[in-house]
Amino acid sequence: MMLRQYWNGVLRETEGSPEGPSYDLIVVGLGTAGAVAAITAARQGLRVLGLEQLPAMGGQGTLGYVMPYYFGGSGGLFEELDRKTREQTARGFAETNGLHPDCKLFVLEQEARKAGAELFFGAGLTGVYLEGKTVKGVQWLREGRLRSAGARVVLDCTGEAEVCVLSGCETRRGRESDGGCQPFSLPMTTYYQRKLCSQFVDSGFLEDPSPESYSRALVETMTGPMYLRDPFEPIDRVIAYSPRLGIREGRRIVGETDLRLKDLLDGKLPGPPLFYACANLDKHGSDYAMESLEMQEWCHIAKLWGVRLALPVPLGALIPKGYDGLLAAGRHLAVDHDLATAVRMKRDMQKCGEAAALAAAQAVARSCPLREVDVGRLRPKLAESGCLDLHPVFMKRIVSRDDGENPPVEWLTDPADIRAGLLSEEPGLALFSARRLGKEGAVLLRKWMGEDALRTPCTLGLGMLGFPEALPELRRLAFSPGEDFWAASSALCLLRWLGEKEDLPALEALAAKGGELRPYALTAARSIRSRISCEKTEDCHEMVAQPVD
């Protein structure tokens, strides 16, 4: 057995075995996902050890002061925990615009102890024990002493895939174009209308997951003008600042099953899901020029940011590729950067912890590898608790924070409905509906493209389908933009994937003018140059847009 550790940033491997007791499940990180996972597993009768570097359970919902929910699916163990939190709050705590963080913290710890889980706070992960690619236990530092324990399954709920990284698992971070992640916030608690309220402001970008980068970002944010105002207005009534950053995106594992926005939009669904993540593609920031084609098409060209999606998450997205004895639960599961904007909400991450714990319980009971967990037997248990919705609504239009009030959205299939949608002020659903029809959709778009009122949406639709015949009109929209920023920037997004060498001078001239279109022109030019370069080496199959069948 080998012990893998980092010493001053250098990975070391030495022979060694855990010296402490052995557990059925060790949960590393008792935040949003890990707290629910530990309680779930202990209630299943597993011997559970929970390790947390902070002084309490709950993560962003407790020590992070993020009191309200933003979407996420209903149902699951967290509903019981939230009900008990509200009951605790009613005993004399201040009313909040969500769940009182201290009350949630008390409930989580009480339920974990009641279920029999052992908890260690102030525990920093220092090493992982492996036999080949099977994780066998972990080592941690607490109160100046190194401790270790073995486990049949280790559940990584660290948010940054720390156990997975120490184990040697492959991870990714940020978007493909520049590695950029979503911005972080520093939550603050204010007293407003006789309630404690959470407030969030996008505060910056974390350069990397290192302690130095995190510390620098925290200090710069805490001492910035948003948090050291002069003077504070009476409406502010700041009660407290969170002692930790609200990080939306970091490392993500490469899983046995990787979830990609492109596949889901194309109707290529993964295996049977353990739960659904329910949210819109809540990308913070407006730098769509740097995003993937699918994100540009969905959020910028089609303007479908305000559509809530039900995204299926299978077991394979929780298993690091090629490894056993190790699961990941939290925002670091195997999704691409696009889906990371949605698969991160607190409700869904609590569901993720519950699902991972039940998968681990079955693997322990059957003494089988995690990849051989019988999902067919697992899904009824998840459905019983409400963690798995067996009949989800794939799309809803967001009109309320209460998802039950949001009306369903369905793809358009009738040509008359698609045409009417393209003529409307919100042509996005019609654009994607035509895209889903493939060649049939292209026939319709070509037919209508000669009409003045339909020329722009039909051009964009053909561009989304990957047909080069859209190029002349895309160039007109991009290089003679007039006052229509949306049409020009949308055309530039598509030229990034469809443009040719002859477009480079015009793109460079447009970028030189500056203004809002500059980043779109720059990224389009960069993409075309890269495509030309790889064409010379005959290694560009991933970069060339292909017409949709």
Language-model features, listed with the residues they occupy:
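Flavin (FAD/FMN)-binding glycine-rich loop and adjacent Rossmann-like elements that form
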Residues: 2-8, 16-19, 60, 81, ...
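Conserved N-terminal/central alpha/beta ligand/cofactor-binding core
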Residues: 2-6, 12-16, 22, 40, ...
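Beta1/beta-strand and adjacent pyrophosphate-binding region of the FAD-binding site
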Residues: 17-31
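Conserved beta-strand elements of the Class I
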Residues: 24-26, 49, 327
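N-terminal Rossmann-fold NAD(P) dinucleotide-binding loop
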Residues: 34
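Short, hydrophobic/aromatic-rich segments at coil-to-beta transitions
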Residues: 133-138
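Structural detector for internal amphipathic alpha-helices that build alpha-solenoid repeat scaffolds
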Residues: 404-410, 425-439, 443, 447, ...
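Amphipathic alpha-helical scaffolding segments comprising HEAT/armadillo-like alpha-solenoid repeats
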Residues: 409-422, 438-450, 467-480, 500-512, ...
